[in-house]
Amino acid sequence: MKVHKGDTVLVISGKDKGAKGKVLVAYPDRNKVLVEGVNRIKKHTAVSANERGASSGGIVTQEAPIHVSNVMVVDSDGKPTRVGYRIDDETGKKVRIAKTNGKDI
């Protein structure tokens, strides 16, 4: 999967189209990412008492995972880009590059 934790991404389709956010968690086995402030849902939790006796529960708003095909990585210029790879000459490791300007991500 070409999107990693910490990347800034732009949502390109869906109800949050045009929103930018930071990837909080990547789920490569499910091809999904959790983006900060995007795809917010209301989750209804049962009321329960915690160890101090205070009750917690009700309606909680939180982010839900979004499919990786609905986001694009934003390059250093702030434009959405596809992601490519190149082999680093010094270390021999794969490095992600932006297809728009060729710079490292």
UniProtKB/Swiss-Prot annotation:
It holds the Pfam family KOW. GO terms for cellular component: ribonucleoprotein complex; ribosome. One of its GO terms (molecular function) is structural constituent of ribosome. Keywords: Ribonucleoprotein, Ribosomal protein, RNA-binding, rRNA-binding. InterPro entries: KOW, Rib_uL2_dom2, Ribosomal_uL24, Ribosomal_uL24_CS, Ribosomal_uL24_KOW, Translation_prot_SH3-like_sf. The keyword Methyltransferase does not apply. Gene3D superfamilies: 2.30.30.30. NCBIfam families: rplX_bact (TIGR01079). Part of the 50S ribosomal subunit. Belongs to the universal ribosomal protein uL24 family. One of two assembly initiator proteins, it binds directly to the 5'-end of the 23S rRNA, where it nucleates assembly of the 50S subunit. HAMAP family: Ribosomal_uL24_B. This is Large ribosomal subunit protein uL24. It comes from Mycolicibacterium smegmatis (strain ATCC 700084 / mc(2)155). The lineage of its organism: Bacteria, Bacillati, Actinomycetota, Actinomycetes, Mycobacteriales. The gene is rplX.
